[in-house]
Curated annotation (Swiss-Prot):
Name of protein: Glutamine synthetase root isozyme 1
Localization (cell): Cytoplasm
Organism in which the protein naturally occurs: Zea mays
Main location per the UniProt record: cytoplasm
One matching Pfam family: Gln-synt_C
Amino acid sequence: MASLTDLVNLDLSDCTDRIIAEYIWIGGTGIDLRSKARTVKGPITDPIQLPKWNYDGSSTGQAPGEDSEVILYPQAIFKDPFRKGNHILVMCDCYTPQGEPIPTNKRYSAAKVFSHPDVAAEVPWYGIEQEYTLLQKDVSWPLGWPVGGYPGPQGPYYCAAGADKAFGRDVVDAHYKACLYAGINISGINGEVMPGQWEFQVGPSVGISAGDEIWVARYILERITEMAGIVLSLDPKPIKGDWNGAGAHTNYSTKSMREAGGYEVIKAAIDKLGKRHKEHIAAYGEGNERRLTGRHETADINTFKWGVANRGASIRVGRDTEREGKGYFEDRRPASNMDPYVVTGMIAETTILWNGN
């Protein structure tokens, strides 16, 4: 008799042309992820081949009970690392039955920015460093920490190895490989300064795909931590006190920045970002004021400053970029729970479309 594991791993490719499409969307909090699956005829190579679908928005905080239908529009597809075969993950955004984007659909506005001819011509690249914390399920306390207590001070944990310094590496490595399988442009992982905290990087990704890839990478991580009985936290400051927070540093460049003379373009873009500091901070994640204190490798939330190789700045420029006179810069302000559609779209809009006045 087949075991549960056998059935979960059942290969359907020899017996049917049907595949399972897992539709993923962002829920009512703007940070929670929801999904449900449907059977479609495969293989699917483009989201345009997939039907729209719907869900009960009254159960996700996105619609009233008397008019609860929200419509899912498939926007990006990835290979499913859980079901494998030809099965897929589908990143969707959400609309009313009349075709209007619902308030939590931030992808719609970002896609408009990225489709603007001036933005498209600049081919904006993003590399997003997604920090996160792994928590013990029943106590909501970081993995590897004594329950109700604290580990030794920060210092030994960043990029460390060893059972007393690195907690949750099996989850991190499983996520890394699952993202590569899915087709996400995940570029690396590392242990972070606070024990139980990790980071993965996605990019360089062009335009709207950066947001799609971060959201699906988050979804895959949620699924893996679910399997491991661990809780994923994107809280930007999960533990009070002398512990690092969690951010989503966003590396950015345009075609003009990557070409000869690009350093002057970078400095002009940073000047624009400084003029809109308050607007960006307001959109860069909930609870970010607990993280951006001027300590623990952050700039104070009320102060905008930039510097070369300065991890205490709002914007950091790398030594290589300064030396070569072209390259990219890093916006260090976004919180770990930021919406990548909002952040990437806003950076492009401010630096490319806004005239600076």
